[in-house]
Structure formats: structure tokens, C-alpha cells
């Protein structure tokens, strides 16, 4: 009667051993999940555009943005300035672009919405270790994002005030460059050229008068070889456009 009991004990022991082995395998394996339930982590709320997302998604993060605004329409369509923005992080670039459009809207300056310019890529190859080995190299890519805002029908003083306000409240890491167009009346270049020609003629006439006065003085005072040398110096000075006072100083130093 002892044999059935022994068989039942052996069968029970054989049934328990695989479970123990399974538990040992589960405890030693790092790829199997534990039996405790896990709650799903909240998904980060990122904007629809992939360019404006942060490089590292964080749970529950709130992106700083401004309310949408419609720029003032141009009254005459005269292009007076263009603001170029560029940065390596598109989120900061979009924030500064929105800030520029809002500030121009507050100053009643007609502008366009920020235009997306072509993205610039730069590839850099550096050593992966401090040792000079050809195989131990690493490549890095740097992207530069760019935006452009056009300004219309605004006074120069208003544009200077707007640019100064943007410079005072600039965001680190975002570069700004403005191209300002000045409109003048027709014939402005001709007037500038005429004024320049008049100044040159006055200077040339004065130089000739000084050279003639020095020549007359040398002819009246000098004799022989000294007279010829004095005349030659005055002629050379006139050719080199040297004033009479400078010529006198050189003569005093030589004597």
C-alpha cells in the first residue's frame, strides 16, 4: 500500500519542478516583464509640424505660442525692408517670427507672414577618439532654418523703432539681419555727381593757384641752378597734388 503513495508523491514533485524552473528563468531573464500592471505613460503633446517639435519629447510639456494675428495689408505695395531670421532650433525661430509679426502689427506696420526659406545643411567630420586613426571618425550634421518677413509702406523711423525693439527683446540663438530700402526722388544721382564735380573743380583750381604762386616766388628769388631746382620741385609737387605748406616743410627739413 506504500507504493501508490510514493508514486503520487513523485508525480506531484515532477509536476511542481517545471513551475520552479519557469520562475527561475523568469527571474533571471531581463527581457520578461513583471506580473505587476503598468500604467501607460502620457503621450507628449507635440505640434503637427515635425520641424517645430522639440528634439526630446517630454510628457505634459506646453509649447509657448502666441495667438494668431493677421498682418495689416499693404496700402501702396512699396517694399521698404526685409527681415531675415535664422537659427539651428526651429522652435525658437518660429517663436521669434511670431513675436516680430505681432510687434509690427502693434506699430501698424504692414508686413507679410513669415516665409520658409530653404534649409541649409552642413556636414562635419571629426575624430571619434583622441588618437589619430582613420577609421575612428564620426559625422555630424548641422541644420540651419531660415525665415523671411517683408515690410511694406512704412516710414524709416517706424522701421528703426521696430528693429530696435526686436534687438532689445531678442532670443538667444536666433540671428537677425535686416535689409532696408531707401526710396529717393528721380535725378538724385545726377545731383550728387554734380556736387562732387564742383568740389573737385574747386580743389583743383586752388591747387593750381598755390603752385603758380610758389612758381612766381621761386623765379623772383632764385638764380641759376637753385632757380631750376626750385621750379622742378614745384612742378613735381603739383603733379603729386602736394599742398604748398607741405612743400615748404620739406624744404625747411632739407635745409
From Swiss-Prot:
Keywords: Mitochondrion, Ribonucleoprotein, Ribosomal protein, Transit peptide
One Pfam family per UniProt: Ribosomal_S10
Stretch list, region Disordered: 30-52, 220-255
Location (main, coarse): mitochondrion
GO annotations of cellular component type: mitochondrion; ribonucleoprotein complex; ribosome
Start-end of Basic and acidic residues biased regions: 236-255
Domain of life, per lineage: Eukaryota
Boundaries of the annotated transit peptide in chain numbering: 1-32
GO terms (BP aspect): translation
GO MF, one annotated term: structural constituent of ribosome
Cellular localization per UniProt: Mitochondrion
Similarity field: Belongs to the universal ribosomal protein uS10 family.
Biological role stated in the UniProt entry: Involved in mitochondrial genome encoded proteins translation. Involved in the binding of tRNA to the ribosomes.
Quaternary structure and partners: Part of the mitochondrial small ribosomal subunit.
Protein name per UniProt: Small ribosomal subunit protein uS10m
Originating species: Cryptococcus neoformans var. neoformans serotype D (strain B-3501A)
Amino acid at each position: 500500500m506504500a507504493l501508490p503513495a510514493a508514486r503520487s508523491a513523485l508525480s506531484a514533485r515532477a509536476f511542481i519542478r517545471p513551475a520552479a524552473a519557469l520562475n527561475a528563468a523568469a527571474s533571471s531573464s531581463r527581457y520578461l516583464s513583471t506580473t505587476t500592471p503598468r500604467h501607460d505613460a502620457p503621450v507628449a503633446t507635440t505640434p503637427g509640424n515635425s520641424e517645430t517639435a522639440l528634439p526630446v519629447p517630454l510628457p505634459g510639456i506646453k509649447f509657448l505660442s502666441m495667438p494668431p494675428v493677421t498682418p495689416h495689408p499693404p496700402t501702396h505695395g512699396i517694399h521698404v525692408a526685409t527681415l531675415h531670421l535664422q537659427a539651428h532650433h526651429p522652435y525658437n525661430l518660429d517663436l521669434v517670427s511670431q513675436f516680430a509679426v505681432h510687434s509690427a502689427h502693434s506699430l501698424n506696420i504692414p508686413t507679410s507672414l513669415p516665409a520658409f526659406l530653404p534649409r541649409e545643411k552642413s556636414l562635419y567630420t571629426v575624430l571619434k577618439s583622441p588618437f589619430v586613426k582613420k577609421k575612428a571618425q564620426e559625422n555630424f550634421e548641422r541644420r540651419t532654418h531660415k525665415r523671411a518677413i517683408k515690410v511694406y509702406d512704412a516710414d524709416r523711423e517706424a522701421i528703426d523703432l521696430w528693429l530696435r525693439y526686436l534687438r532689445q527683446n531678442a532670443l538667444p540663438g536666433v540671428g537677425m539681419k535686416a535689409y532696408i530700402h531707401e526710396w529717393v526722388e528721380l535725378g538724385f544721382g545726377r545731383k550728387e555727381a554734380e556736387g562732387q564735380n564742383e568740389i573737385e573743380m574747386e580743389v583743383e583750381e586752388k591747387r593750381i593757384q598755390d603752385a603758380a604762386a610758389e612758381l612766381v616766388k621761386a623765379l623772383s628769388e632764385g638764380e641759376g641752378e637753385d632757380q631750376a631746382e626750385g621750379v622742378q620741385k614745384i612742378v613735381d609737387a603739383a603733379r603729386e597734388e602736394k599742398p604748398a605748406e607741405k612743400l615748404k616743410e620739406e624744404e625747411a627739413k632739407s635745409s
